[in-house]
Regions:
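N-terminal membrane-anchoring alpha-helices
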Residues: 1-40, 202
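Short, intrinsically disordered low-complexity segments
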Residues: 3-5, 61, 188, 194
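Enrichment for repetitive, rod-forming helical segments
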Residues: 11-13, 69, 155, 193-196
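Structural signature of transmembrane alpha-helix termini at the membrane-water interface
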Residues: 20-27, 67, 188, 192-195
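A structural signal for short, hydrophobic/glycine-enriched beta-strand patches
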Residues: 23-180
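A transmembrane-helix-recognition feature enriched in membrane-embedded lipid enzymes
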Residues: 173-199
């Protein structure tokens, strides 16, 4: 085998190894650090907004599930975290509008409008909670996103648990597998740069 072949083989092994690392980390990711069933806040992790300023199905599912949890009495308020992504619309504002349309009073909504990734979702939400003296949160997001979110929140000084937002429409096997694969790659990226969580940096 020539040097090019060895390089290709080594690169393939490295990529597969990193993917396996991410997959194992997702399987072992924590889902909570507390037995609490009632919390000071529900943190809704942002998802992209469409080009017309409306929630995407993923974002709508997260907000809808958070509204259900609010109505069940899990927490008295929602922290909606997400800044501007690929267009001019702020995720937190769109989520707040969606929550109000579903009957949540504006007084129960706390938008966090700066975060551009999941690390910042956690860090900036924690800063809001610390300012208000809130100490516990349920973290709502899509099921495929929650393992990475759990790894991130496990490094924050906060009592928390994750809660999955089921999709509003059934997902195809291809869509589900694609989402898991993308999250595995993002988990690897996070594991490489995990210490940045401690400094609230992207």
């Amino acid at each position: 085998m020539g040097w090019k072949g060895r390089l290709i083989l080594a690169s393939s092994v490295l990529i597969l190894g990193m993917f396996a690392w991410g997959a194992i980390a997702r399987q072992l990711a924590p889902t909570s650090n507390t037995p609490l069933t009632r919390f000071d806040a529900i943190i809704v992790l942002g998802a992209p907004v469409d080009d017309d300023g409306n929630p995407t199905p993923e974002q709508l599912a997260r907000v809808t599930e958070a509204v259900h949890e609010y109505e069940r009495g899990v927490a008295p308020r929602l922290i909606l975290t997400g800044g501007t992504d690929r267009n001019r619309f702020v995720e937190a504002n769109v989520m707040a509008r969606t929550a109000m349309a579903q009957g949540i009073p504006e007084s129960a909504l706390v938008p966090e409008m700066q975060a551009t990734d999941t690390i910042q979702n956690g860090c900036y939400s924690l800063r809001i909670m610390q300012r208000h003296g809130w100490q516990s949160a349920e973290v709502v997001s899509s099921a495929s996103h929650l393992p990475r979110a759990g790894l991130i929140f496990s490094r924050l000084q906060l009592e928390w648990r994750t809660h999955a937002a089921p999709p509003l429409e059934p997902q195809s096997a291809i869509d589900s597998s694609t989402a898991d694969a993308m999250e595995t790659l993002k988990t690897v990226r996070y594991l490489i740069w995990a210490r940045q969580t401690d400094h609230c940096q992207p």
